[in-house]
Amino acid sequence: MADTIIPESLFEPSQLPTPTENLPAVIHDNPGQMLRSFLSSPFISASLPLKDIKKNVFRRKYNNITLSLASTSEKVPYGKYGRLLLTILTTHAVIGNPDDQEGNILVHYDSIRQLLKEMQLSAGRSNEIKEQLEYFSKSTFVFEERRTSVVQKSLFKDMIDVDDCYKKDKLEATLVSSGIIPFMEGMQYIELTEDGKKSNQFCITIKLSPAFVKFSKSHSVPINYSTYKAITSVVGKDIYAWLTYRNNGLGKGESVFIPAHSLVEQFMPVKEGSHENQERTNYYFIVNQIKEIKEKYYPELNISFNQDGMGVTLRKSVAQIEPDDSRYVLVTSNL
């Protein structure tokens, strides 16, 4: 594994921690405390793969957002542990202060076990988290968003040639925003070996890229990490984050109808060549996930299901979490 460790020149000597620097032995003193983390809204609309796709490229499109993941390794981040790690990395990007003028943020852990404690996971999940961490360290995402609105042609009078064929006074203008964003600029750790057997990783330093930091600070929203982690279904995690996000965007007395097809496209897209009833099957799986979330985790959720299976209506509900919600402690609070 030594040949995959980032060269020391990537980090200034002052940025590298000693094995016990700045990290407590216990991350959270109150295991019953609700924890708050952050997740960027594009990853709520178009999330990571649900499972291991065994490819190094993944593309997801939802409405006006297209998200493409690409990795120099054999796989991209995926599944429930990829999602948990993403919200941890995003939270550090949101609340952290850049360590240099370029905008990097360094995150230090004494060992993989301290990262697991921060994530509220048992030591038995170290292999899964190490695996996802490696995928993130070698992955970038391409984010494209298209926003269309109707504008007066006069707004572009200095840019439109007289012979251009725009006849009407009002035009459709689409703003296309895109960027290639690596999650990290590098990662460094020590692996101790005895008799040829690998042990856990120690002295982990993660260097979040300036682009990822800026993106996270601009687009992230708070989520209840305790609930997000407790939901065992990967699709359920995505649905819960989306319900929280959409509800927080509604005003008092407002509601929004989401067609069944849109729900399926967002959370469980149907592959080409699938059975003709697959979309209907996926929709009712999503409905059951929403019902379970309401029953177990979000009883205040005000949502109704169209009896003919055409979609769901979300009405403004009591917010589970607000920005800077005093009921919650940041998942990274003791780092």
Regions found by a protein language model. Name each.
Residues 2-335:
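Charged, alpha-helix-forming regions
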